[in-house]
Every structure is written in structure tokens, then in C-alpha cells.
Amino acid sequence: MMKFLTYIHVYLIQAILNFLPFCWIDVFYDNQTYIGNQLHHPIYLFLWAFSSAIGFYYYSKKIWEKYNVNYIKKNHALICLGMILSCSIPYNDITLLKDLHVWLSILFVAWFILEWFLYIPVHLNKNSILFFINIGLSFVFTFMFGHITGFCEIYFSFTTNILLHHWMFQD
């Protein structure tokens, strides 16, 4: 039953949540927080962040358990909760708080990537190489567009969840 639910999560829920921005914004310029704050769809933004972070949390956890990787459970949970929190902070006109959501998002995503860099060398295989390529492409898209766009966020969220999901069930 859990396997079925993970397929629903990745290939239905994630697909829908990552398709919707293409209908609402220019994904190559605007980002997900624009949808939540300026277009007044905070529930969408929360669901997208929650769905992405739950996938990152659960699939990573299962992979590390499968390979007996000794990871810090509290750090991993904090990282994924931080991703959700960063998307829950509204825009603010106060200069010091204006970009807080951006910096928190960057911090927690970078921490997630760093966490994987620490654990991947333990079991370097085809999946970890794909994971490195995926992260590299995420950076390329960010530099190509000059900032973090909806496309960059969608790409990282969707492809990372797909790769982790596939890796989790691979023997």
C-alpha cells in the first residue's frame, strides 16, 4: 500500500503541483513565492513546499536505511521542515525581512544537497551519478536565468523526487 501511495505522490500529486505554475506565471522569470504572495495562492505554495519536502524527507530516509547509511535523523527532519517554513514566510516591506524567505530557502536546500554530498560517496553508483547531474543542471538553470525562477524550483523539486523515488525501489 505504501509503495502505491509513493507512486501517487510522485507521479500524480507532484506532477499536478509542478504543472500549475506554467498556467499562472512566466516560470522563466517569476518564482513559486510570487504565486503564493502576489497572486494570493498561499495554500498552493504550502502544498507544493510540503509535498516536495515530504518526498525529500521520506525517500532520502528510506534510501539511507536501505544502504545502512548512518545519517543524523534530527538534522534531516529539520532541513525538510525548514524548506516548508521558508515557503510559508510572506513578503515583507521591512528591508531586513524582505528576502528572508529566499535566504532560508537557499540555506535549507543547500543543506539538503550538502547532506547528500556527505552520504553519497558511501555508495557511489549510477543513481548517485544521476543525482549529481540533477543538482548540476539545477545550478546551470539558475545561472542561465540569472536568478532562482519557478522553472528552477519546479525542476529541482520534481526531478529530485523522481530520482529519489526510483532509487528507493531499485534493488
Question: Where are these predicted regions, by residue range?
Answer:
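Hydrophobic cores of alpha-helical transmembrane segments in multi-pass inner/ER membrane proteins
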Residues: 11-18, 45-59, 107-118, 156-171
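Membrane-helix interface and helix-disruption motif detector
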Residues: 34-44, 91-105, 144-154
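Membrane-interfacial loop-to-transmembrane alpha-helix junctions, especially the N-terminal start
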Residues: 4-11, 67-79, 123-133
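N-terminal topogenic module of multi-pass integral membrane proteins
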Residues: 1-69
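Membrane-proximal helix-loop-helix units in multi-pass membrane proteins
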Residues: 76-131
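Terminal transmembrane helical module of multi-pass membrane proteins
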Residues: 123-171
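Juxtamembrane "helix-exit" motif on the non-cytosolic side of transmembrane helices
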Residues: 62-64, 87-96, 120, 140-148
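Membrane-proximal intracellular helices of multi-pass ion channels
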Residues: 70-78, 82-84, 88-91, 145-151, ...
